[in-house]
Every structure is written in structure tokens, then in C-alpha cells.
Amino acid sequence: MSQALPETLESRLTEAFGTDAVGKLSVPGSGVVAVVLAYNEALRFPYFLEHYRALGISHFIIVDNASSDGTRALLKGMADVSVIPTDKPYRDHKSEWRQLLCERYLQERWVIFPDVDELFVYPGWPERPIGDLTDYLDTNGYRALFCPMVDMYPGGPLKNVSYRPGQSFLDACPWFDGSGYRLAPLKGSHRKRYKTPARHVFGGARERLFHHNSKRPGTWVDNFVLKTFFSLKSPMPKTRFGRLADHLLFKLVKNALPDTAAVQSKIPLIRWGSGYKFSGGVHGIAQEIPVAPVWGALLHFKYLDDFQSKVSEALERRQHTDNAGHYREYDAQMALLMKRGPFDGGSTRFTGMESLLSCGLVRGKLRRKHRSATREH
């Protein structure tokens, strides 16, 4: 009895996407490429593309997951965009789609993985192109950039938001939480299964608005430990022993924190290596790889005109984590958000990179002459 031939990359691509066209893309041989998964994003795509083109992205590979709002027609004919249509379930294939595309087209290339409601910014933005950033990363041997996700929102009720395609997202949602974050290890088995990064960001507007349940009240000891060891400005552990000590120390305070804690960070810019495996989203990867001490940020624009319809859509499709668990939280608070909005007295207005640097949501800077970076202290 003859042995079956090993599964080829092309056949895996065809199976994952449901089309053999995915193996025939024309992707430039240089520059940073964006790999984007999208569903019904016609509202955001015009400005999203404008922003990332201004950064210097050379090409966009966009997986259109059966959009029905004109997204595909909007993207048609753009020379720097390759669209892969698929109706396969997002929840079952999101990691595989990204990984297979990189294995096929982007080995040892810099790849960015933004959602369409995310704007990537970094030290030196908007003056410095993304090529300066990847030059720094290459020169210093780093293979990934860590980025907090910063939820952006309007200064009033969501019912008053009026956004039009092509307008800057920041015109509609210029506010964010400048405090209330922590930099901590993951709980449970994910900490062992996904080694990069060593810590993740939690907190911010999402936790303030939606996550208040904890196993016990916090104490002054909890506050001291969190402020001293797990603030945004605390260092990442760099050794196996450091990670273990980090885990044991965090166990002292974890029961005083919300049981449901959304990860508010990603590693969206990666020099792709063979076999890399995502943790579902772009929050972490299984392999331990060198991550730069410099941080960028992903400005996250969920609260536009379509927020309510997007939540209803997500609840109906159930394609997101935990059967759209986060969207159930949004839905439970919808009336209050539409009436009052996420803004509160501690909100900070985004006026440029200094807004993020000053509160620890971005680290470092790019030097103009040598294309290298130094750590902000």
C-alpha cells in the first residue's frame, strides 16, 4: 500500500480559503506588507488605506470574509491591494489564514497585521516612514514590535458620532484613557503555550467600562505590587527565571483583578519566520523571539457610527472569541454608551505621539541620523 504524499502548502491554502486563486497572488519582493482580515469595512477602508500608505506599506493582502456592504467593490482595481474572497468561518481559520499567507509569500519579510479599525503609530510617526522603523529592528536583531491597543472614543454620546468614509478616525474619536493599565503575564495555560511576548497590557477604557468583577476586593498591598512591578513602565522579564518569578508574583494579586480581562496589546509587526504560530489573534505567538524595547501603539477605533450595528452583527455571526463574548458586554451597556459615551473626567486627548509617550503607552524614539532607537526613561 503506497503512502500518501505529504500535504502541500498550495493544497492547505486552497482548503483554508476555499479557492485556488490564493496561491497565485502577485506580491512585491520588497517593503512591508499588510495582511488584513476584513468583514463589512467599507466605512473604514478609505482612511485605513490612506493611513497605511502614508506609512510606506508596499502592498495589502486583504482577506474579505464574505462582506455584503460593498467592501470588495471598493477595493477592486487598486494596484497595491490583493483581495482574497472567502466564505469560510472566521473563528475557525483566522490564525491559519494569516500564517499560510506568510508561509507562502512573506518568509523573512516584515509583515504588519492590523485590523481595519486599528491605526498603527510608532516613535517618529508621522514624519518617519515605517522603513526607518524596520531598519532599526533589523539592525538590532529584533523580530517583533510590541504595541498596546488604545481604545479611542468621542467626547460625547455615541449617538452623536457622525463619521464619513475618508475622514480621519481621529476627527471623530480623539480621546483615550491615559491611565488604568497594567503590564502583566497571562493567566493559565496560554502563558506557557505562547511565549512571545512575556507580558501583555490589560486595563484601559474596556476594563473601566465593562470588567469590574473580581474574586476579592483590592488592598493596599495589591496596589503596591501592581504599581511597583506591573505598571506600563516596568521592564519585561528576559529570562526563564524572570518569567517564573513574574508569574509567582502576579499570583499574589490576580484575584483582586477582574476575572474577565481583555488583552489590550498585540505584536502586529513581525519579521515572519517559518513555523510561527499565532495565539488565535495577533496577541502572541508560540515561539520565543526577540521583541524590541521600543513600543508602537494600535489606536483602536471601534466607536464610530456603526458601533451598534457592528455589535448586533457580531452577536448574530458568533465568529469572535468566546462566541462573541466581548460583544455581549458591549450589548449589555449599549443604552448607556449611546446616551453618555465612554468619555469620563480622566480621559486624555490625543494630540500626537507625545500623548502616548507621556503615559507609557509607547516607549522609545528613533534617532534621525543613525536610524536607531533609544529607550525613553
Enumerate the language-model features and the residues they cover.
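Active-site-proximal specificity loops/subdomain of glycosyltransferases
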Residues: 12-13, 70-113, 121-127
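Short beta-strand/loop segment that forms part of the nucleotide-sugar
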Residues: 58-66
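Catalytic-site signature of metal-activated, phosphate-bearing donor transferases
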Residues: 2-8, 124-377
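A structural signal for isolated positions on well-ordered beta-strands in alpha/beta enzyme cores
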Residues: 33-35, 60-61, 82
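Short acidic/polar active-site loop segments enriched in Thr and Asp
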Residues: 58, 109, 143
